[in-house]
């Protein structure tokens, strides 16, 4: 199974955990350049996966609200 297929089957939480691990490794700063590039590429794929999963959930929530006759567009609160 390729890394892409593995990533597609990950849950949001698994992808976030793996992304956090990659960030920690890169922040340590003692990773060889080639390995750092590979980590960065994997991190970008995981970031996109998480973003796509969040967008999917957002659309599901908007659809559920529409079924109840009320549509409130998703708008994240600013912290």
From Swiss-Prot:
Gene Ontology molecular-function annotations: exodeoxyribonuclease VII activity
Disulfide bridges in this chain: none
GO cellular component, one term: exodeoxyribonuclease VII complex
Main localisation: cytoplasm
Subcellular location: Cytoplasm
InterPro entries reported for this sequence: Exonuc_VII_S (IPR003761), Exonuc_VII_ssu_sf (IPR037004)
Reaction equations catalysed: Exonucleolytic cleavage in either 5'- to 3'- or 3'- to 5'-direction to yield nucleoside 5'-phosphates
Keywords on record: Cytoplasm, Exonuclease, Hydrolase, Nuclease
GO biological process, any: DNA catabolic process
The protein's Enzyme Commission number: 3.1.11.6
Record-stated family: Belongs to the XseB family.
Description of how the protein assembles with itself and partners: Heterooligomer composed of large and small subunits.
Functional note: Bidirectionally degrades single-stranded DNA into large acid-insoluble oligonucleotides, which are then degraded further into small acid-soluble oligonucleotides.
Protein name: Exodeoxyribonuclease 7 small subunit
């Amino acid at each position: 199974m390729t890394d892409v297929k593995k990533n597609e089957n990950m849950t949001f939480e698994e992808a976030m955990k793996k992304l956090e691990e990659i960030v920690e490794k890169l922040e340590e700063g003692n990773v060889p350049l080639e390995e750092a590039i590979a980590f960065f590429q994997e991190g970008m794929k995981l970031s996109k996966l998480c973003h796509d999963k969040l967008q999917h959930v957002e659309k599901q929530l908007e659809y559920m609200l529409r079924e109840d006759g009320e549509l409130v567009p998703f708008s994240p609160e600013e912290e």
